[in-house]
Amino acid sequence: MSAELSQSPSSSPLFSLSGADIDRAAKRIAPVVTPTPLQPSDRLSAITGATVYLKREDLQTVRSYKLRGAYNLLVQLSDEELAAGVVCSSAGNHAQGFAYACRCLGVHGRVYVPAKTPKQKRDRIRYHGGEFIDLIVGGSTYDLAAAAALEDVERTGATLVPPFDDLRTIAGQGTIAVEVLGQLEDEPDLVVVPVGGGGCIAGITTYLAERTTNTAVLGVEPAGAAAMMAALAAGEPVTLDHVDQFVDGAAVNRAGTLTYAALAAAGDMVSLTTVDEGAVCTAMLDLYQNEGIIAEPAGALSVAGLLEADIEPGSTVVCLISGGNNDVSRYGEVLERSLVHLGLKHYFLVDFPQEPGALRRFLDDVLGPNDDITLFEYVKRNNRETGEALVGIELGSAADLDGLLARMRATDIHVEALEPGSPAYRYLL
C-alpha cells in the first residue's frame, strides 16, 4: 500500500515543524530514551503478504513512546521556567513519561489525575518520578483534572506540558521515525500508527514527508473515539459528544489544533481508518499468544488496523506498538470483547417454563456439540408460569451460529437474542 507525497506538513501556516527539528530532537533526547527494536513479524507478514515489522515502543523505558515528547519539551525550558515548576494532567502514559523526564532532569513537577485513576497507574507515576513528582487528584473526571492543572499554571506561573498539541512534544514523538529509517535498509512503503490526540502521527508524518520519497502513513483510531477523522471531515478540530473509553490511550474527544494542521497539510500521504474495540482486543490477544507482546489497547491499534487494511503484497510495512502499560485485571474484559468480535460469544434471554425438566430440554434440544454455556443467571418466581434467564453461549466456530438459532426457533421455549449495542448488552461488557 502506498501513496504519492503531497505537500509537506511543515507547509501549513499553523504547523512550523521540520525534519531537521526532529533530527535535533533525536540528539536531544538520546541520553534518556532507549532506541527500541524493529522486530520482524512472520505471522503478520504471512497474513498480509507484506514484510511487516513491529516498532516496539512497548519496550521503551516507561513502556510507551510518551517519554520522547515529554523529555524533548522539558529539556528545552529555561532555568527560570524549570524553577517555576512544570505541570501535566494525565492518568496514563503521558504522566509516566513526564514523571520520568522530571526525575532525569531533577525538576519538580505536578501531575493532576482524575479520582477514578487506578492505584496501579498512580503507583507507576510515583515510581517513575520519585521525589520529583507530586500526584494531585484534580476532580472526578479527566476534564476536571485538566482544568485543575490549568488553574495551577495560571496561579503559579508553572509550565504546562501537553500530551500532544505542542511542537516540542510532536518533535519528540517524531523521533520514532528517525529510528525506523535508521533501522531499515530501504524506506518503508507504509507506516501504521495509532491515533489519539495526534502527536505521534503528526511527528512521524512530518519526518517521513521530508526524508522519504514514497512512504505512506496509515493512522488507526478506535471506532468509538475517532476525533481526528471527525476533524479532517469537518475541516477543523471538533469535540465529540461521546467517547468510548476502552482504548484509553487513544480516547480523546478532540484532536489537537497543531496535530490536525499537520495531517490536513499532508494530503494524500496520510489516510485514516477506524477499528472497533473488539478487533483491538483480538489483536492484543494475538500479539500476546504469538509474539509474546503485552500490548495495551492503544498499543495494539496499529496491528488491528493493519489486518483490516488493503495491504499491497510485497510491500514493507512498519506497525507501531505504542505502549505496553496494560492492567492485567482487564484481560477478562479483553477476552470477552474479542470473543464477541469473532462471533464466538452470544447472549440470550431465555423464558423458561417454571416446570421440571425445562432446563434439560433446552440443553438437549438447543445446544450443539461444540456449544458451551458460559453464563447462566436465573431466579425462580413461584407466582409466574415462566422465568427469564440470562444465558451466555460460546460457540466452537462462528459458523455454528446459524444452527444454534435454527434450533432455538424450533423449540417451544421463547428465546430472545441480545443485540450488541443494546443497553442490556452494554451492561455485560
Swiss-Prot record:
A Pfam family assignment:
Thr_dehydrat_C
**Entry GO MF terms:** pyridoxal phosphate binding; threonine deaminase activity
- Could you state one GO biological process linked to this protein? isoleucine biosynthetic process
Q: What is its EC number?
A: 4.3.1.19
The pathway where this protein functions is: Amino-acid biosynthesis; L-isoleucine biosynthesis; 2-oxobutanoate from L-threonine: step 1/1
Names of the cofactor(s): pyridoxal 5'-phosphate
**Which reaction equations make up its catalytic activity?**
L-threonine = 2-oxobutanoate + NH4(+)
Residue positions, PTM N-acetylserine: S2
Q: Which domain of life is it from?
A: Bacteria
Q: Which residues bind pyridoxal 5'-phosphate?
A: N93, G196, G197, G198, G199, C200, S322
Q: Does the keyword DNA repair apply?
A: no
Enzyme class, top EC level, equals: lyase
Question: Where does the record place the modification N6-(pyridoxal phosphate)lysine?
Answer: K66
**What S-S linkages are listed for this chain?**
none
Name the job this protein performs. Catalyzes the anaerobic formation of alpha-ketobutyrate and ammonia from threonine in a two-step reaction. The first step involved a dehydration of threonine and a production of enamine intermediates (aminocrotonate), which tautomerizes to its imine form (iminobutyrate). Both intermediates are unstable and short-lived. The second step is the nonenzymatic hydrolysis of the enamine/imine intermediates to form 2-ketobutyrate and free ammonia. In the low water environment of the cell, the second step is accelerated by RidA.
**Quaternary structure per UniProt?**
Homotetramer.
The entry's family comment says: Belongs to the serine/threonine dehydratase family.
Q: Which NCBIfam families does this one have?
A: PRK08639.1 (NF006390), THD1 (TIGR02079)
What PANTHER family does the database record attribute to this sequence?
A: THREONINE DEHYDRATASE, MITOCHONDRIAL (PTHR48078:SF11), THREONINE DEHYDRATASE, MITOCHONDRIAL-RELATED (PTHR48078)
Protein name as catalogued: L-threonine dehydratase biosynthetic IlvA
**Gene giving rise to this polypeptide:** ilvA
